[in-house]
């Protein structure tokens, strides 16, 4: 990692320094490090950027020295949400590093796609076309390339997108609004058609997500049920994204399919971990906390780590805390939400 990311900076805001120290300290409880990360993410994502933006980005990037694949993948996600070109170099370094965990590299590629800068295209295309790379890396780079091309296209300017309840920058935008809106069954058909480009299928996924929020929307349960079918897709990347979307939605109708995914010991760790964290966001639903506790000693490290974070999130949901974050005494309270 570049020295600017790991060296102790001088003249940096005390709050950022405090959060950074917690984030990079391997002796700190993982849940506390996650809360520090989400506090830094809030600062790094402020628009317009402030004098704290770059130090917050550098503080997040400093965490890539961690031994936790779960934490590193979340760092990459947070950097991808900043809309800031200063995050690009850190993500490029991670995605090119074949010694990094595949889950972390995938999230770095996705983050580059979310940032949308065409300077990342050459690296992403090379990884997409490299037959020696793992499927999850190639597929993520494929979607990221398509998203960057879309972001910088004339087509994007002419598309009318349905306003979303979610502020996240997604791997793909929802399908554009048309004179006659596609039915949930039409979107489900696109979602599950493995012959279509992943980018197009992701667009259907996020269109379905937006039809499931708020939870009392008449289309919500049907949209959740359609999305749940994606958890049987042959692509692990695709399955993990469905679980992530369920974590955003926090809809009780997703609990059975998420529980089934987490319980499947043959499922890939990156999918099970996402199911665990999604269940954590549903911590106020009866039985969810007990389900999570069953996997505290799971054989897979990333799943065990996710359970720790998920139980912390579940506690936050039950207690109705204002923000899932670690706000030092010197910082003014800010509404910070988990990714």
From Swiss-Prot:
Catalytic activity: [eIF5A protein]-deoxyhypusine + AH2 + O2 = [eIF5A protein]-hypusine + A + H2O
Subcellular location field: Cytoplasm; Nucleus
Enzyme Commission number: 1.14.99.29
Pathway(s) of this molecule: Protein modification; eIF5A hypusination
Residues binding Fe cation 1: 73-74, 106-107
Cofactor: Fe(2+)
GO cellular component, one term: cytoplasm
Location of the region described as Disordered in the Swiss-Prot/TrEMBL record: 159-183
Residues holding Fe cation 2: 240-241, 273-274
Keyword annotations from UniProtKB, A to Z: Cytoplasm, Hypusine biosynthesis, Iron, Metal-binding, Monooxygenase, Nucleus, Oxidoreductase, Repeat
Co-factor binding comment: Binds 2 Fe(2+) ions per subunit.
Function as written in the Swiss-Prot or TrEMBL entry: Catalyzes the hydroxylation of the N(6)-(4-aminobutyl)-L-lysine intermediate to form hypusine, an essential post-translational modification only found in mature eIF-5A factor.
Identification of the protein by name: Deoxyhypusine hydroxylase
Organism of this sequence: Aspergillus oryzae (strain ATCC 42149 / RIB 40)
Designated gene of the protein: lia1
């Amino acid at each position: 990692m570049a020295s600017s990311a790991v060296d102790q900076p001088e003249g940096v805001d005390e709050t950022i320094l405090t959060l950074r120290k917690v984030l990079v300290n391997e002796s700190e409880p993982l849940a506390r490090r996650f809360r520090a990360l989400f506090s830094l993410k809030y600062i790094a994502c402020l628009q317009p950027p402030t004098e704290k933006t770059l130090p917050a980005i550098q503080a997040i990037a400093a965490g890539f020295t961690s031994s936790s694949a779960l934490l590193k993948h979340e760092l990459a996600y947070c950097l991808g949400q900043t809309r800031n070109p200063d995050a690009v170099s850190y993500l490029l370094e991670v995605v090119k590093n074949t010694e990094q965990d595949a889950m972390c590299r995938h999230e770095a590629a996705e983050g580059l796609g979310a940032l949308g800068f065409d300077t990342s295209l050459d690296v992403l295309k090379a990884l997409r076309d490299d037959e020696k790379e793992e499927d999850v890396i190639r597929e993520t780079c494929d979607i990221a390339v398509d998203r960057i091309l879309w972001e910088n296209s004339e087509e994007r300017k002419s598309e009318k997108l349905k306003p979303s309840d979610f502020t996240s920058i997604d791997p793909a935008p929802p399908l554009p609004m048309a004179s006659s809106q596609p039915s949930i069954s039409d979107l489900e058909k696109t979602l599950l058609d493995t012959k279509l480009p992943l980018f197009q299928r992701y667009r259907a996924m996020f269109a379905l997500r937006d039809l499931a929020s708020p939870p009392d929307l008449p289309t919500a349960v049907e949209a959740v049920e359609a999305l749940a079918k994606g958890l049987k897709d042959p692509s692990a990347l695709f399955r993990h994204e469905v679980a992530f979307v369920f974590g955003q939605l926090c809809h009780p109708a997703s609990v059975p399919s998420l529980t089934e995914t987490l319980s499947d010991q043959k499922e890939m760790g990156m999918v099970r971990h996402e199911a665990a964290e999604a269940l954590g966001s549903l911590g106020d639903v009866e039985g969810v906390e007990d389900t999570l506790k069953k996997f505290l000693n799971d054989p897979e490290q990333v799943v065990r780590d996710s359970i720790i974070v998920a139980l912390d999130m579940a506690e936050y949901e039950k207690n109705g805390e204002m923000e899932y974050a670690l706000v030092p005494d010197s910082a003014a309270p800010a509404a910070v939400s988990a990714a």
